[in-house]
């Protein structure tokens, strides 16, 4: 399984990280196979305020996340 880290930050546009999060999360489910990706969010602080004032809690802080194979920066 590959680790996919999505870096989030204050004023991030919600669709810019939730779209890729969803795609990597459901990849492989239709075929009934094992999930090929472990997807998680990473930030400099635990709580992030998105552009529309939505409060998001990051899965990991920088330096504490599993070693990523893929890093996405919206």
What are these regions (language model features)?
Residues 1-74:
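Extended, subdomain-level signal for the structured scaffold at the beginning of enzyme domains
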């Amino acid at each position: 399984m590959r680790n996919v880290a999505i870096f989030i930050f204050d004023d991030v546009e919600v669709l810019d990280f939730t779209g890729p999060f969803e795609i990597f999360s459901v990849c492989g489910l239709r075929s009934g196979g094992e999930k090929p990706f472990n997807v998680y969010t990473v930030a400099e602080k635990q709580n992030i305020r998105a552009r529309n004032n939505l409060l998001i809690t990051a899965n990991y802080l920088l330096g504490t996340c599993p070693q990523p194979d893929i890093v996405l920066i919206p």
